[in-house]
């Protein structure tokens, strides 16, 4: 009996985790019609250049453009009973609704070498713009190459 309940819970968790992503435009990396992601929590002002943004990140972090952001915050869910809330993290409920931004699928934004070129950072990146800590690790999906800790640029401007 206990084994069948555990097997049912594991099967349900696997089916929820294997669901395809929603086709909603707010979750698209570059938005509908290449107009940017409407789900950017900390937007960067329109007049900020790539050089200004890179200077704000400092020499210990690199300016990055991130396709995916997960926000975890101040909400606390108290679940009671056997297996209550065991799958809430998989379905998007409970703790992790809003707040601290964890960024994924980031690529480095290069500062223009030529003096006089003032590219606006919002033209280079339509997604989440972040300052990611310099590290020799890689964020390629394996467990050893841990993703870099990043902070939204809009939250520190």
UniProtKB/Swiss-Prot annotation:
One Pfam family in the UniProt entry: Hydrophobin
Entry's localization field: Secreted; Spore wall
Induction cue: Expression is induced by the transcription factor brlA.
The keyword Signal belongs to this UniProt entry's keyword annotation: yes
Range of residues in the leader sequence: 1-41
Main location: secreted
UniProt GO MF annotations: structural constituent of cell wall
Phenotype of null mutants: Impairs the production of thin, proteinaceous, outer spore-wall layer, called the rodlet layer. Reduces biofilm formation and the retention of the hydrolytic enzymes within the vicinity of the fungus.
Gene Ontology biological process terms from the UniProt entry: asexual spore wall assembly
Subunit structure, as described in the record: Self-assembles to form functional amyloid fibrils called rodlets. Self-assembly into fibrillar rodlets occurs spontaneously at hydrophobic:hydrophilic interfaces and the rodlets further associate laterally to form amphipathic monolayers.
Family: Belongs to the fungal hydrophobin family.
Protein name: Class I hydrophobin rodA
Native organism: Emericella nidulans (strain FGSC A4 / ATCC 38163 / CBS 112.46 / NRRL 194 / M139) (Aspergillus nidulans)
Lineage of producing organism: Eukaryota, Fungi, Dikarya, Ascomycota, Pezizomycotina
């Amino acid at each position: 009996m206990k084994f069948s309940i555990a097997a049912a819970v594991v099967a349900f968790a696997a089916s929820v985790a294997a669901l395809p992503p929603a086709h909603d435009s707010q979750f698209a990396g570059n938005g509908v019609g290449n107009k940017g992601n409407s789900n950017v929590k900390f937007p960067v002002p329109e007049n900020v250049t790539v050089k200004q943004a890179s200077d704000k990140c400092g020499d210990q972090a690199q300016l990055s453009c991130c396709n995916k952001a997960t926000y975890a915050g101040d909400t606390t869910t108290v679940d009671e009973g056997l297996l209550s809330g065991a799958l809430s993290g998989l379905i998007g409920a409970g703790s992790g609704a809003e707040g601290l931004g964890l960024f994924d699928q980031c690529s480095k934004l290069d500062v223009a070498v030529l003096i006089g070129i003032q590219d606006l950072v919002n033209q280079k990146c339509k997604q989440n713009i972040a300052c990611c800590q310099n590290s020799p690790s890689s964020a390629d999906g394996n467990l050893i190459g841990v993703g870099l800790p990043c902070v939204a640029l809009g939250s520190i401007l």
